Amino acid sequence: MEPVTKWSPKQVVDWTRGLDDCLQQYVHKFEREKINGEQLLQISHQDLEELGVTRIGHQELVLEAVDLLCALNYGLETDNMKNLVLKLRASSHNLQNYISSRRKSPAYDGNTSRKAPNEFLTSVVELIGAAKALLAWLDRAPFTGITDFSVTKNKIIQLCLDLTTTVQKDCFVAEMEDKVLTVVKVLNGICDKTIRSTTDPVMSQCACLEEVHLPNIKPGEGLGMYIKSTYDGLHVITGTTENSPADRSQKIHAGDEVIQVNQQTVVGWQLKNLVKKLRENPTGVVLLLKKRPTGSFNFTPAPLKNLRWKPPLVQTSPPPATTQSPESTMDTSLKKEKSAILDLYIPPPPAVPYSPRDENGSFVYGGSSKCKQPLPGPKGSESPNSFLDQESRRRRFTIADSDQLPGYSVETNILPTKMREKTPSYGKPRPLSMPADGNWMGIVDPFARPRGHGRKGEDALCRYFSNERIPPIIEESSSPPYRFSRPTTERHLVRGADYIRGSRCYINSDLHSSATIPFQEEGTKKKSGSSATKSSSTEPSLLVSWFTRLKLLTH
């Protein structure tokens, strides 16, 4: 970029044509006086008065735009966060020292005068200018994404507002100075803390200029940039539209400042004049951008994509069986080299209701797959429903493993069970005083070890028969409602937990590979066809024996 001090009078006139509309009436006066770039950077209120710019407001607009050119010309290679903080600290110290030295003077009239001296107001203006230069850095990437710098920025803004409000109040100068000293001391503390606590190299890195070419712009396509202009004429890019020319260039990032458009400096211009300059050449645009350092704040200045919601594409066919793993998704995102703002991927819902699957992708309740060995731990999600798959595998292993159920070998080869016809006594436990009927009781091993309450195996078995893990129940055809009896079949029935929590019913014994069942205190041996023992069917119940003993005692 050519220094502003080397500008010709024509370049100065071209620059003034992009300023505010109210200043266009003075363009011919700049052209008539043939003011070059070096004279422009040194222009003052008196020079503008001689040019014919008599209105104070118009003079301030010109001088603010010239200040931006001075910062671009003289401060590009020297301005960084550390220097800006030091400048703000120096300005606050100067103001504090001025007030202290003035109060030591014998001619001090702060307690009686309501008019602040010009030197005091000038020091306040310099302090606010230094704060504005620092805020211009803190208000952009990468500092906007850091909490500490955001808090510092908000504090400085509030202190500057308090400072400007204080000097405009109608009060004694001494009271005004007291409030200003309070603000200055807080600013000094913020600057000292920022310098001491921040050790990142980005504090000492300066900005740089980069030229970006956007060729082959299609008619009606646009550049795809979002630009925010400050009140004094800085143009900052806040984002780019996805797949736009600006996005495809991979060189335009959020926080970049537009300095030139097609070799024309646009610093201090109105936004509408900048847009007009961007549309001047429909075939392509050459931009000169001022880029801030990124440092090691874990911030990558990638394009800020359009934040408007993009509706997903309508699926006309079922989704494919294979889903993309997070590892492959991560690799793809790295290849695209788009960071800073990540695209959220929301997986589509499955085409069919969810059923747990094993690692091979087959259903776990199909009746043909067995899990005889513990499954390995999850190696990563393989589908949007991977958490449910892993949870299902974990629960199967915890409950169905024979090592976890000592004395009760349980297989996971579960066959669908048929639902019996509901009777008036359905779900009610058998009274303990009733005799054990061999027609409906299962086989009990008299030498089996009794199970104590609270055992881990029993808890696991009860969980196994809860309504969350039993196989689908198939409705059986109607049968005569026998009380406590079933048609004689070759299958043995055992007592288990019903699918209704808290009740008991009799389910197929094929669910177990062992004849041992819980609740052994309620079971007896079944009558065998080849054995002559009939004690299990003829033995009186406990209640009958109690009545017999009672009669003996009464006699």
UniProtKB/Swiss-Prot annotation:
DUF1170 domain location: 325-546
Region (Disordered): 309-334, 347-390, 517-537
PDZ domain span: 211-293
Domain CRIC per the UniProt entry, residue ranges: 80-174
Keywords annotated in UniProt: Cell membrane, Cytoplasm, Membrane, Phosphoprotein
UniProt domain SAM: residue ranges: 7-72
Keyword Cytoplasm in annotation: yes
Phosphoserine PTM positions: 381, 383
Taxonomic path: Eukaryota, Metazoa, Chordata, Craniata, Vertebrata
Its job: Involved in transepithelial sodium transport. Regulates aldosterone-induced and epithelial sodium channel (ENaC)-mediated sodium transport through regulation of ENaC cell surface expression. Acts as a scaffold protein coordinating the assembly of an ENaC-regulatory complex (ERC).
GN (gene name): CNKSR3
Compartments, as annotated in UniProt: Cytoplasm; Apical cell membrane
SUPFAM superfamilies according to UniProt: PDZ domain-like, SAM/Pointed domain
Example of a GO biological process term: negative regulation of ERK1 and ERK2 cascade
Conditions for induction: Up-regulated by aldosterone (at protein level).
Any one annotated GO CC term: apical plasma membrane
Recorded domain comment: The PDZ domain is required for interaction with ENaC and SGK1, but not for interaction with NEDDL4 and RAF1.
Assembly behavior: Interacts with epithelial sodium channel ENaC. Interacts directly with SCNN1A (ENaC subunit alpha) and SCNN1B (ENaC subunit beta) C-terminal tails. Interacts with ENaC regulatory proteins NEDD4L, RAF1 and SGK1.
Protein name per its UniProtKB record: Connector enhancer of kinase suppressor of ras 3
Family membership: Belongs to the CNKSR family.
Superkingdom: Eukaryota
Record membrane topology: Peripheral membrane protein
Chief site of localization: cytoplasm
Keyword Iron: no
